[in-house]
C-alpha cells in the first residue's frame, strides 16, 4: 500500500549568489541567483520522487522571500506552514571550486528571519497532523539558541505523535557562535531520533565516534565492512533510540574528481554500497542532502535498508552533475544508475 503521509522538513532556506564560470568573488560583475538550504533541498528531492513533502521555516514578508516560496512550490513542496516575520532572508555566497582550488562559502545570515524564530511560533501539533516523518539538521540548531529550542520543540511533538524522526548532523563550525558547542546541543536531540545521518568528520566532531574516512581512489575499489563495524556498534550504544545510522562517505581527489559511497547500520547489521566516481563534478553543494533525501524516500516507500542505501548513494552521485542546491533527478534516473547505467550516453 502506498504511503501517503507527508514528510516535514524544518530549517532555513537562503538566497545563493554564485559568480559564473568558476570566477572568484572579486572577478564577476554579475552573480547567478538560486535558492537553497539543507532541509529545503531534502524536501525538493522528496517532491521530485513523488512524495508529499512540506518545508517549514520563517521568512520575511517581502518579494525575495515570496520568490523562494514560489520556487519551492514549483518543485512540488508544500509551504502552507511557513511563518512570515522578521526583516531579511539569509544569504550565502558560493565561489565554486576548480581543480586544486577549493570552494569558498561566505554566510550572511545573522539577523535573518529564521534567526528571529522563537519557541511557540510554530504549531507543531497541527503541522504534523497528516505527517509520518520529521527531518531536521544540525544547521537549524546552530543558528541560535532559540532555533535550537524550536528544533527540540518539534522533535518532542513528533515523538509524541509517533512520527519517524531523522537528523542530519550537518556540522558547520562557523555557525556555532552563541556560547554552546555542537556536542552540547545536538547530542541530546540526536538521542531522540530514529535515523541519523552524517559524514565521518561529523560523527567524530559532534558525537565523538570515530568513523574511518573514505580512502578509495577508484570506483572499482570496494568498502570493507570491517572498517566501519566498530563505529556502527559505538553509535548503537550511544544512541539506543536510533534504529538506523547512516554514514555518508566522500573522498575529494580534487575539486573536479570525487568518489562517494556510504554505509548503513541497522539491527546489528552493517550494509555497504558501491563506490561512485564522479569526474567532472559540476556542483557539489547539496550532495549530502540528495543522499539523505534518497534514503528517506526509499524507506518511506517501503524499500529495504539495502535498497535505500543503494538509492541514496546513487542520488548523491548524480547530484554532483546538477547545478544548484536542488537534486532534480527522478526515481527512474536514480534507479537506472543503481542498475548499472552510468555511461552518460544520450537517452533516446
Language-model segments: residues:
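Conserved N-terminal subdomain of the carbohydrate kinase-like
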Residues: 52-139, 334-348
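Short catalytic helix/loop segments, enriched in acidic residues and glycine
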Residues: 24-42
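Alpha-helix C-terminal capping segments
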Residues: 24, 41-52, 298-301
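Conserved phosphate/ATP/ADP-binding segment of small-molecule kinases
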Residues: 175-269
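Hydrophobic beta-strand scaffold residues
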Residues: 53, 79, 165-166, 197
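A short helix->loop->beta-strand "cap" motif at the edges of active sites that frequently abuts
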Residues: 157-164, 239-243
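Positively charged, low-complexity intrinsically disordered leader regions
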Residues: 1-24
